[in-house]
Amino acid sequence: MRILGLDIGDRTIGIAISDPLGFTAQGITTIRRKSEAYDLEEIKKICDKYEVDTIVSGLPKNMNGTLGPQSEKVLEFCDLIKEHLNIEIKMWDERLTTVAATRAMLEADLSRSKRKKIVDKVAATYILQGYLDSLSK
């Protein structure tokens, strides 16, 4: 069984998957959001394909640790996922993951257009890898 990582935004959802042993995270795709039904179906397809038993979603907290409007949207969508897919969902503090992902892509000398296409997938990888690393401590 594998763990799925999500970076949920208003326009896209970055997706990452763990290896079967749960040691490493790999970005697999970015879903361009269309509707709740479409988004849930796309996530379900990925969960079925990889035999996912747990989902880790990034929770966008403010720098002082409080939850803002974007956090509420993410929590509501995660409740929908839980309802429709019956998969355990864990929340992971995603502060600065997009910043770290962008920095890594800049260091890799990726063009702006390439970075824009994959930043959410890379951020989902950072979220999931952080969670996986916490399990091994």
Swiss-Prot record:
TM spans (from-to): none
InterPro entries assigned: RNaseH-like_sf, YqgF, YqgF/RNaseH-like_dom, YqgF/RNaseH-like_dom_sf
GO cellular component: cytoplasm
E.C. numbers: 3.1.-.-
Annotated localization: Cytoplasm
Principal place of residence: cytoplasm
Assigned keywords, A-Z: Cytoplasm, Hydrolase, Nuclease, Ribosome biogenesis
GO molecular function terms listed in the Swiss-Prot or TrEMBL record: nuclease activity
One Pfam family it belongs to: RuvX
Record flagged with keyword Nuclease: yes
GO biological process, one term: rRNA 5'-end processing
Record family assignment: Belongs to the YqgF nuclease family.
HAMAP family per record: Nuclease_YqgF
The protein's role, per its UniProt record: Could be a nuclease involved in processing of the 5'-end of pre-16S rRNA.
Name used for this protein in its record: Putative pre-16S rRNA nuclease
